[in-house]
From Swiss-Prot:
A Pfam family matched in the record: Pan_kinase
Gene: coaX
Species this chain originates from: Aromatoleum aromaticum (strain DSM 19018 / LMG 30748 / EbN1) (Azoarcus sp. (strain EbN1))
GO cellular component: cytoplasm
Protein residues bound to ATP: 6-13, 122
Description of how the protein assembles with itself and partners: Homodimer.
Protein name: Type III pantothenate kinase
Protein family membership: Belongs to the type III pantothenate kinase family.
Residues annotated for substrate binding in this entry: 90, 97-100, 172
InterPro entries: ATPase_NBD (IPR043129), Type_III_PanK (IPR004619)
Length: 242
């Protein structure tokens, strides 16, 4: 069995696979990282850990400490020029975030036509993946929660809003929430224009904020939970077969 780890800015997502089968999956906040040891204890057949980490060196060290029971150090995946049928056309391929890279690999395995790969969380990433497997570039913007916090922290009279989304807001809280959410959806739809004319073009939408965006998108899309974990599974299986 293999333990997959997606250490993000807010949460640590995990999954356990055996061959093609998913055995278990879940998520922890950073403060609960030691509980990864319980996952190891519950799955005594674990032999490898494969993961991505964008949360920094301290979290990486805490994860490694919690997973000592596996018997081998975590294999952290980093972006490269090519892997699992995806070619990285970033100006400096190694600079691409590991989570974005692995999400692209997961998307390639799920959808062979042109696609827009969206991961909506603390930050929102929107990446263009060609039918050829070429990653043609993408954008990063603050997630909805960060946008709301930026308004609250950098203006004198705007609070951290707990409003709701409406088409034409008539109060400040709703105006902030609706504006931030429209900004997310608008960025996604604008990026989709680059591939909208291509056969089978589709958006793959993942991340903790995906549910809030679904009702706003006027483009073909599929909701894919834990796309980074799915990409890690592709990487782990390819390595095992090599």
């Amino acid at each position: 069995m293999i333990l997959l780890i997606d250490a993000g800015n807010t949460r640590i997502k995990w999954g356990v696979i055996r061959g093609e089968a998913w055995i278990a999956e879940g998520a922890l906040i950073h403060a609960e990282v030691a509980a990864l040891g319980d996952i190891v204890a519950a799955h005594p057949g674990l032999r490898r850990v494969v993961g991505t980490n964008v949360a920094g060196a301290d979290i990486a060290a805490a994860i490694a400490a919690a997973l000592r029971g596996v018997g081998s150090a975590p294999q952290w995946i980093h972006a490269s020029a090519e892997r699992c049928g995806v070619r990285n056309r970033y100006d400096n391929p190694a600079q691409l975030g590991a989570d974005r890279w692995v999400a692209l690999i997961g998307a390639r395995a799920l959808h062979r036509a042109a696609c827009l790969v969206v991961n909506a969380g603390t930050a929102t990433t929107v990446d263009v993946l060609a039918a050829s497997g070429d990653f043609d570039g993408g954008i990063i913007l603050p997630g909805e929660d960060l946008m709301r916090r930026a308004l609250a922290g950098n203006t004198a009279q705007l609070p951290f809003a707990e409003g709701r989304y409406v088409g034409a807001p008539r109060n400040t809280a709703d105006a902030i929430v609706s504006g931030c959410r429209n900004a997310q959806a608008g960025a996604i739809e604008r990026m989709f224009r680059q591939i909208a004319h291509l056969p089978g073009a589709r958006c793959l939408l993942s991340g903790g904020a995906a549910p809030q965006l679904e009702e706003l998108l006027g483009i073909p899309f599929s909701r894919v939970d834990n796309l980074v974990l799915k990409g890690l599974a592709v990487v782990a299986r390819e390595d095992a077969a090599a």
